């Protein structure tokens, strides 16, 4: 049975004429426009794309058969797949496609579940893994050897080591028994909600 991997995701509509915003997960991000056929997760619906422009961290594209904003909006969140054997094999056994990581479970060094990899982004300072944490929060982890020391594609397992205080709220904490000043609790909650996360692209 051939393995299918996700190579792109439709982020939503762009404008009123049916164009979409597209996030590519391939190492050469433009290569996704040369792959065919692209299908949805079920494999039953095919998509033909034509690149029309570039946005911030995404491409703009036309999809065959999509001519209006409503139809384009209906595709929001759709992930596009390709048969794994249509991609050239990595030259080294330790190499892999970024797309191979999408959907893999992550665990900590002591084998505790951490979350599921949803996407890989480059925000300008290196690749980041978007992970749906077991707490149901979305977190972003630097895709470095220090933070991601073990990747086992065949086993579907990735070991992560988040930086120290990854989930700790920023700012000073009150001493035990000390009350927080007015407004500090709301500010702290806002900081905590953003700890270890980044805005959705």
From Swiss-Prot:
Q: Which UniProt keywords apply?
A: Chaperone, Cytoplasm, Ribosome biogenesis, rRNA processing
UniProt superkingdom: Bacteria
Query: Mind telling me which InterPro entries this protein's record contains?
Result: PRC_barrel-like_sf, PRC_RimM, RimM, RimM_N, RimM_N_sf, Transl_B-barrel_sf
Q: Does the keyword ATP-binding apply?
A: no
Q: Which SUPFAM superfamilies match?
A: PRC-barrel domain, Translation proteins
A GO BP entry is: ribosomal small subunit biogenesis
List, alphabetically, the GO terms of the cellular component aspect.
cytoplasm; ribosome
Please give the Gene Ontology molecular function terms for this protein: ribosome binding
**Annotated compartments:** Cytoplasm
- Give all residue intervals belonging to the PRC barrel domain: 92-166
- Keyword DNA damage carried by entry: no
From the UniProt entry, list the residue stretches annotated as the region Disordered: 169-201
Oligomer and partners: Binds ribosomal protein uS19.
Q: Which family does it belong to?
A: Belongs to the RimM family.
Stated role: An accessory protein needed during the final step in the assembly of 30S ribosomal subunit, possibly for assembly of the head region. Essential for efficient processing of 16S rRNA. May be needed both before and after RbfA during the maturation of 16S rRNA. It has affinity for free ribosomal 30S subunits but not for 70S ribosomes.
Annotated domain remarks: The PRC barrel domain binds ribosomal protein uS19.
Under PANTHER family, the record lists: RIBOSOME MATURATION FACTOR RIMM
Please name the NCBIfam families in this protein's record: 16S_RimM
What name goes with this protein?
Answer: Ribosome maturation factor RimM
